[in-house]
């Protein structure tokens, strides 16, 4: 049997078609209609169509690489399964469901074929499967029914829709747009809509009002043929058929469409429906509310009175009464209604109409209009600004001639936008302007940099706003430089730290150093002060270097006060130590600037004193006005507790020295064990710490030679040295050796051991001082437990000589002053050195090397015996056994005694 190839080929083709259809059906059942495959649904925005059966979803394309006409679209979804379940609950027939679905298909088909700005634009035609139907249109906001409060079939009502309040101006503009669309349908498309109602009027995302719901539309030819014309039949009782409405809503239907004998339909029928819609929008309530009951409808229609129009503006009443007339011939055309005083008397509406056709005007007309709009736009409400004014202005930003006029209005209106609307509507129009702005346009954008920054994400900030600021830094216009410096901090807070250090910070430094305008430098320094909190320490040091270079040439008061602001910011960010090390060295020379007034100087001093106070608090030492440090209470090493009022000098000298100190051959006897000195025995142990000596100064006696020769011309001086007898004195274990038990400094305990404290010089001028030795060669052992726990013994078998060089090098004290006060007053001045005004000898290392020996014979020249003689400063520190000569301002609390009550004197040879 032969095979017919033609028949075989046809059979294969039919099989392939069946397979393809089966695969397509299977895919649709799994993935849904084509709209769901190409677009990703976002949130439901509303509902529309007959009975609000359509669910409206905002959506975006899944394939972002393909060019799209709209960044977002609106997907109309109708769930067949939910519709079927609702039909069963309402006890309706399957025929009613099929009739309703046919109505939906007819509506979508006519909507695709109609192309007009007043008709909803279809992006993707209707597609359906067994479970759903889907249609893709331009982005929408909601239906007018949703805007009037009917949110049936809306799951989660959007925030904007829930709080929506349409102003009368928006209603006027919407009605004017619908009337123009009706004029197109009647005169150009030759269509009669027959179902104009809030459910079939859509508001786009741009704020325009457009028509949909053409399921009941017929051509003008069909309307004139009464044989083919079918009337709508409504019951004489209340019927709730909103689930599957197969007829237009009776509340907006013309009466002639309900006549069963001679029904007629024409353009006037749409005018009546349009009048009902206008009444509902303006009066905020429907004219007819009859629940599809024809009797109630006719009663309301026959008894319409003037009171029914009491809430309608007077300029609209006459036109509205004509539109709602039962006589079709009395009704105006759609074109006639556009000329109503209700529209033409409103200047704001005329402005919106001009904006609708702005792209069609020339630059001269645009310029005149925009100048008038600059004073008028403040009267618009937020919704009108957002949906009616802003979109055409953003589109016109491409016109470089009109940019300086349009941009201020755009930026001001953008302040009322949320972040999403700004990124979708305003930012795309601003991006080309941001990249090319210069002059006044650049200045304006920099002033509104905070607005753009707060309404964009970091990606747009780096790609669009940051290049704008960098161009502003490099611009020569002083106004632009000032503004960009003022806005730098707020922008820097939202940028990465590395971007700030690499892009913004160097340009701020450059403006601070290169500018010759005081305002720019001040703003640059203030910007640096605000940026300190986001920078690290090396960057802060660079800021200080810039300030140092600025203040070297500019010490004006504004610059200096900005410097203080930077210093305060650094102190707050990095603390006292960093500020003391790097900032004080910069601030101190500025205190002498004569440009600072009293208040400004006080602020500078307050800052410096605050730093010093914090350093004192951190060290635990407070220096009073007299220069004496007050140490906070703390426990000593041996467990003794010092009083808070104890004033001690700072200990600097170390006990662990390689060579013995000048006073290591003197012990420090305890006050409690001292014998023969009643004055010193009245003081307690804490008095050892009340001596005013400056141990922070190095010993100035170390420059003297170890051995000196006795003078031959100096008159003899009787020196008495009463060694204090104590029951606790014992012979030393070894001679010429000092044993130190602890490393604590013991210099503060020598104030009680001054061998020259109580000797009254005798008027014996015939002898010369050659040498001094211990009487009878007796060795004394002094022991004392110092506050730091120091215990030492000294063998004083060695003799010590009072050389002429040491005596002649001492400056004579003033005879009118006492060496030390009886009440242990502090002999140190505020700088911690011995007070020269109290008769203390002043020692400097240079005085021993460079000055001539001073004649001190006048001190002892008086033949008059005095009960309390003037003290003589001790010899240099390097001579063994020469007492205390470390430049201290005073000795212990011992007072001089009459010679009769003292022990035998030293032999002065």
Swiss-Prot record:
Gene Ontology MF, one: clathrin heavy chain binding
Against Pfam families, the record matches this protein to: Pkinase
Anything noted about its domains? The protein kinase domain is predicted to be catalytically inactive.
UniProt domain Protein kinase: residue ranges:
39-343
| Compartments it resides in | Golgi apparatus membrane; Golgi apparatus, trans-Golgi network membrane; Prevacuolar compartment membrane
Q: What's one GO BP annotation on this UniProt entry?
A: root hair cell development
Source organism, top-level taxon: Eukaryota
| Tissue expr | Expressed in roots, seedlings, leaves, stems, flowers, and, at low levels, in siliques.
Provide the primary localization: Golgi
CDD domains in the cross-refs? PK_SCY1_like
Which stretches of sequence are listed as region Disordered?
A: 624-772, 804-909
Q: Which family does it belong to?
A: Belongs to the protein kinase superfamily.
Q: Give the SUPFAM superfamilies listed for this entry.
A: ARM repeat, Protein kinase-like (PK-like)
Give the HEAT repeat ranges. Answer: 311-348, 350-382, 383-401, 402-439, 465-502, 499-537, 578-617
Instruction: State the protein's purpose.
Output: Probably inactive kinase. Component of the AP2-containing clathrin coat that regulates clathrin-dependent trafficking at plasma membrane, TGN and endosomal system. Together with SCYL2B, required for cell growth, plant growth and development. Essential for polarized root hair development probably by mediating the root hair tip localization of cellulose synthase-like D3 (CSLD3).
Biased amino acid composition, Polar residues: 638-648, 678-712, 724-747, 804-828, 835-852
Q: What is this protein called?
A: SCY1-like protein 2 B
Q: How does it assemble?
A: Interacts with VTI11, VTI12 and CHC1.
């Amino acid at each position: 049997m032969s095979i017919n190839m033609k028949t075989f080929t046809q059979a294969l083709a039919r099989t392939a078609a069946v397979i393809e259809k089966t695969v397509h059906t299977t895919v649709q059942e799994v993935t849904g209609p084509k709209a769901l495959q190409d677009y990703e649904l976002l949130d439901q925005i509303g509902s529309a169509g007959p009975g609000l059966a359509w669910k409206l979803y905002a959506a975006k394309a899944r394939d972002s690489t393909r060019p799209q006409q709209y960044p977002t679209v609106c997907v109309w979804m109708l769930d067949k399964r939910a519709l079927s379940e609702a039909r069963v609950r309402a006890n309706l027939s399957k025929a009613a469901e099929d009739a309703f679905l046919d109505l939906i298909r007819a509506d979508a088909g006519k909507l695709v074929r109609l192309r007009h700005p007043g008709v909803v634009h279809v992006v993707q035609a209707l597609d359906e499967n067994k479970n759903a139907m889907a249609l893709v249109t331009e982005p929408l906001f909601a239906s007018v029914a949703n805007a009037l409060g009917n949110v049936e079939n809306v799951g989660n009502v959007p925030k904007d829709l829930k709080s929506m309040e349409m102003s009368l101006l928006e209603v006027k503009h919407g009605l004017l747009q619908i009337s123009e669309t009706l004029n197109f349908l009647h005169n150009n498309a030759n269509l009669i809509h027959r179902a104009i109602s809030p459910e079939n009027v859509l508001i786009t995302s741009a704020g325009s009002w457009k028509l949909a719901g053409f399921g009941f539309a017929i051509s003008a030819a069909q309307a004139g043929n009464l044989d083919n014309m079918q009337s709508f039949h409504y019951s004489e009782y209340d019927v709730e058929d909103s689930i599957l409405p197969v007829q237009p809503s009776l509340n907006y239907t013309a009466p002639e469409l309900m006549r069963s004998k001679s029904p007629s339909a024409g353009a006037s029928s749409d005018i009546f429906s349009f009048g009902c819609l206008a009444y509902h929008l303006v009066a905020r309530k429907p004219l007819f509310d009859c629940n599809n009951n024809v009797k109630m409808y006719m009663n309301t229609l026959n008894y319409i009175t003037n009171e029914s129009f009491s809430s309608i503006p007077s300029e609209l009443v006459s036109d509205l009464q004509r539109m709602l007339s039962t006589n079709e011939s009395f009704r105006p055309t759609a074109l006639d209604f556009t000329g109503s005083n209700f529209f033409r008397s409103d200047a704001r509406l005329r402005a919106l109409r001009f904006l609708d056709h702005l792209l069609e005007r020339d630059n001269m007309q645009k310029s005149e209009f925009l100048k008038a709009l600059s004073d008028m736009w403040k009267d618009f409400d937020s919704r009108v600004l957002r949906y009616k004014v802003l979109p055409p202005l953003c589109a016109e930003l491409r016109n470089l001639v009109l940019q300086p006029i349009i941009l201020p209005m755009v930026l001001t209106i953008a302040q009322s936008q949320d972040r999403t609307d700004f990124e979708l509507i305003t930012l795309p129009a601003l991006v080309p302007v941001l990249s090319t702005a210069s002059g006044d346009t650049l200045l304006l954008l920099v002033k509104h940099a905070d607005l753009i920054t707060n309404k964009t994400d970091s990606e747009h900030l780096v790609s669009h706003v940051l290049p704008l600021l960098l161009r502003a830094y490099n611009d020569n216009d002083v106004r632009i430089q000032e503004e960009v410096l003022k806005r730098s901090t707020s922008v820097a807070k939202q940028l990465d730290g590395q971007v700030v250090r690499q892009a913004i910070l160097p340009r701020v430094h450059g403006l601070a150093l290169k500018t010759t305008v005081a305002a720019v430098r001040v703003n640059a320094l203030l910007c640096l002060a605000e940026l300190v909190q986001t920078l690290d320490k090396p960057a802060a040091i660079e800021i200080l270097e810039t300030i140092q270079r600025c203040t070297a040439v500019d010490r004006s008061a504004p610059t200096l006060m900005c410097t203080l602001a930077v210093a305060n910011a650094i102190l707050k960010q990095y603390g006292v130590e960093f500020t003391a090390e790097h900032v004080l060295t910069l601030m101190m020379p500025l205190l002498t600037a004569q440009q600072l007034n009293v208040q400004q100087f006080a602020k500078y001093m307050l800052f410096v004193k605050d730093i010093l106070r914090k350093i004192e608090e951190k060290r635990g030492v407070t220096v009073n006005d007299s220069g004496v440090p007050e140490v906070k209470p703390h426990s000593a090493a041996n467990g003794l507790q010092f009083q808070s009022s104890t004033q001690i000098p700072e200990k600097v000298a170390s006990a662990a020295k390689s060579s013995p100190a000048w006073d290591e051959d003197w012990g420090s006897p305890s006050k409690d064990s001292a014998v023969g000195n009643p004055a010193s025995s009245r003081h307690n142990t804490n008095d050892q710490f009340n001596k005013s000596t400056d141990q922070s100064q190095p010993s100035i006696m170390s420059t003297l030679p170890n051995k000196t020769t006795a003078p031959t011309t100096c008159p003899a001086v009787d020196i008495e040295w009463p060694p204090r007898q104590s029951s606790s004195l014992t012979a030393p274990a070894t001679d010429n050796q000092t044993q130190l038990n602890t490393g604590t400094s013991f210099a503060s305990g020598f104030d009680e051991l001054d061998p020259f404290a109580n000797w009254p010089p005798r008027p014996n001028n015939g002898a010369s001082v050659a040498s001094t030795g211990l009487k009878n060669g007796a060795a004394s052992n002094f022991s004392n437990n110092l506050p730091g726990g120091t215990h030492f013994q000294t063998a004083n078998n060695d003799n010590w000589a009072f050389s002429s060089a040491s005596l002649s090098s001492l400056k004579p004290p003033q005879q009118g002053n006492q060496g030390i006060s009886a009440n242990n007053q502090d002999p140190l001045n505020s700088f911690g050195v011995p007070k020269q005004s109290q008769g203390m000898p002043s020692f400097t290392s240079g005085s021993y090397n460079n000055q001539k020996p001073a004649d001190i014979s006048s001190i002892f020249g008086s033949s008059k015996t005095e009960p309390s003689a003037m003290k003589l400063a001790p010899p240099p520190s390097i001579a063994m056994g020469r007492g205390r000569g470390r430049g201290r301002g005073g000795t212990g609390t011992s007072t001089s005694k009459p010679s009769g009550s003292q022990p035998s004197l030293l032999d002065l040879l």
